Amino acid sequence: MTTFSPREIVSELDRYIIGQHDAKRAVAIALRNRWRRQQLDPSLRDEVMPKNILMIGPTGVGKTEISRRLAKLAGAPFIKVEATKFTEVGYVGRDVEQIIRDLVEVGIGLMREKKRAEVQAKAHVSAEERVLDALVGTTASPATRENFRKKLRDGELDDKEIDIEVADAGSGMGGFEIPGMPGANIGVLNLSEMFGKAMGGRTKKVRTTVKASYTDLIRDESDKLIDNEVIQREAVRATENDGIVFLDEIDKIAARDGGMGAGVSREGVQRDLLPLVEGTTVSTKYGPVKTDHILFIASGAFHVSKPSDLLPELQGRLPIRVELRPLNKEDFRRILTETEASLIRQYRALMETENLNLDFTDDAIDALADVAVHLNSSVENIGARRLQTVMERVLDDISYNAPDRAGAAITIDAAYVREHVGDLAQNTDLSRFIL
């Protein structure tokens, strides 16, 4: 759990997302409140519930990206789901409890990586011994082993090929659910894991270079040093206390006027979400998981429906409302130049792999922003995603011919941008299909 202050969280988000200060503030406060809750007396800690957030704004303005970056910053189990993928219990499709099961799986992965990092130094020593066994055999004299160990550490043997035995991660068959007990996935996979542990696990022989072998061997040795039960227990605890669920497209399950047909099923999904957001216990193959303190961030464009079309009970469980504004020309300009991995920086780096130097003038950046704003207003507003379409169109020729122009320096100016997308941008009918 991060100890960043709300101000530090916002400045961290500013590196990747332009504008939307209100939304950043809301998620920063929500994340800081999780840390504050952990400092409380246990008797009061259980009473402090997370304040779930509803983000309202058009597509491509940063709703998903804010949540994704927040989860990465927090180092917390995070899952993004589309509300439209779920159906009411009894219908064909995924039921909403699967969200929590998937979140626990993410938590297990995070915890396993954390534990592996803790034992990496020990695992590296064991991995080195296994590489030496592969190089000189187990019966070699101590002097020979030390001689090869020195060469190994100096990198002299990095490209030598060796045969190593590593755990066979692909062994075993999928489990099956016990009827009437969703989530209790006790099956062949679990049985094979149990027998695997008893008999030392299944292995496979792999031929690889000395340098490349370390990745598999360190992972293998790390897994021998960590306790799976501890991982599962701590992952469930982390999921319950720090987990973040991002519910996208929630406006698509808002009931509209005339409550027949699909609308009834949409309302059913909302009713199924209620206990999850309010706090319930979900059965998973790692044990029961309480959802009381999981933070839910819902988002939607609400073009056709409005937040008040959601069930009143669900509205009440999303107390913090944040509106994200549409992007203007200045925002597009900043997205192209100021973000940590801006599109211009990405394309420059891609072309450098072909030994091609790509440069954009200030008026080219203005022209790109102009075209994106014009297309969003005249065709369909898809926010910052429009920039990717425009950039691909502008750089199409350069990308195609890059291998033949190695060593060249290309400067893109406003005239070049207009030449490649100007006509299409002006012709609205064509733009609808091409840009």
Curated annotation (Swiss-Prot):
It is found in: Cytoplasm. One of its GO terms (molecular function) is proteasome-activating activity. SUPFAM superfamilies: P-loop containing nucleoside triphosphate hydrolases. Disulfide bonds: none annotated. InterPro entries: AAA+_ATPase, ATP-dep_Clp_protease_ClpX, ATPase_AAA_core, Clp_ATPase_C, HslU, P-loop_NTPase. GO terms for cellular component: HslUV protease complex. GO terms for biological process: protein unfolding; proteolysis involved in protein catabolic process. Transmembrane segments: none annotated. SMART domains: AAA, ClpB_D2-small. Signal peptide: none annotated. ATP binds at residues 18, 60-65, 248, 313, 385. Its main location: cytoplasm. Keywords: ATP-binding, Chaperone, Cytoplasm, Nucleotide-binding, Stress response. It comes from the Bacteria. The keyword Endoplasmic reticulum does not apply. A double ring-shaped homohexamer of HslV is capped on each side by a ring-shaped HslU homohexamer. The assembly of the HslU/HslV complex is dependent on binding of ATP. Belongs to the ClpX chaperone family. HslU subfamily. ATPase subunit of a proteasome-like degradation complex; this subunit has chaperone activity. The binding of ATP and its subsequent hydrolysis by HslU are essential for unfolding of protein substrates subsequently hydrolyzed by HslV. HslU recognizes the N-terminal part of its protein substrates and unfolds these before they are guided to HslV for hydrolysis. This is ATP-dependent protease ATPase subunit HslU. It comes from Rhizobium etli (strain ATCC 51251 / DSM 11541 / JCM 21823 / NBRC 15573 / CFN 42). The lineage of its organism: Bacteria, Pseudomonadati, Pseudomonadota, Alphaproteobacteria, Hyphomicrobiales.
